[in-house]
Amino acid sequence: MMIEMRLMGGEKKARESVNEYPALNEYLGIEGLPELTTAAQKLLIGPDSPAIREKRVCSFQTISGTGAVHLGGLFLARFHPQHPAVYLSSPTWANHNQVFTSAGLSLGQYPYFHPETKGLDIDGMLAGLRAAPAGSVILLHPCAHNPTGVDPTQEQWKQIAQAMRERNHFPFFDCAYQGFASGDLIRDSWAIRYFVDQGFELCIAQSFAKNFGLYGQRTGAFHFVAAPGPDAVSTTANIATQLSSLQRAEISNPPAYGAYIASRILNDPQLFAMWEDDLRTMSGRIIDMRKGLRQRLEAKGTPGKWEHITDQIGMFSFTGLTEPQVKLLKEKYHVYMVFPFSSPLAPLGS
């Protein structure tokens, strides 16, 4: 059902027009499709961002979000003078560990999920950020945290930014669900825009798998944003050269088909509006599934508190169930959950 919805409206029209492109089977450049990466910058950082206007952003099309994280990891491992460790939230997307270690980076963790409240452990997170060695790379999920579904509030993001500023940490955002979390593209990128506006030097991995339905086309982007300053433009140009050398050695040319589809939608006002409507529909359905699940659990008098199901956001929910409870669901009812007991909400029926 979810994929069928994604192929409706703007995306279906974009695919039809892209199929007629005469250059569809030609190589893209090493940096990817410029019309896509330029539009992707504006989608994440904002079309009026001083960082874009001042040419402090360089962008490369990647093999979806995983490829973007990988390219960023390689860049940090090869060219960051301090060779910092990458600190991941506890828990995080499982593949983060493999991608960064394969790039040759050491890893650390900071507290994130509070098992008792089933919400954000903001005090533990801030303490963990302040305890990390100065200049560490901090991997952050800007929206729809995977796998907990727990996001900081805007006020908490400001506290996180302050703690990172105190320790001169380097933010690395992994943005896989923009527009798919709340249905609002601007709201879902608020944390990124705030950090950029605060003058952080940072990088962003961007995936178009979920919000465009381009799973098999593997379309994404990696962005580096330089801090404002007299050398910002030359710094950005130098980093673009370094990224180009890494991209050439890894994949040479990113895939074209998904890039043309995403670019067509992002650069056509009518298709963009249709796409936004589809995002609101899909994210709204998941929000409704959360409400319905909580209502049914509470109506049946299920022991425990269940407000965390509606407080969390995105495709996954940390249920708070115990290991014996999850085992019972699996063996008796064939309900399967990802360790440690995160449940995908999209497959639920009404």
Give the ranges of each region predicted by the language model.
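Cationic, amphipathic, low-complexity alpha-helical segments enriched
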Residues: 1-8, 345-348
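Conserved PLP-binding catalytic core of the aspartate aminotransferase-like
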Residues: 274-332
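Active-site PLP attachment segment
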Residues: 188-238
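Catalytic-loop motifs flanking and including active-site residues across diverse enzymes
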Residues: 68, 216, 258-261
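Hydrophobic beta-strand scaffold residues
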Residues: 107, 171, 202, 336-337
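Walker B catalytic acidic pair
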Residues: 175
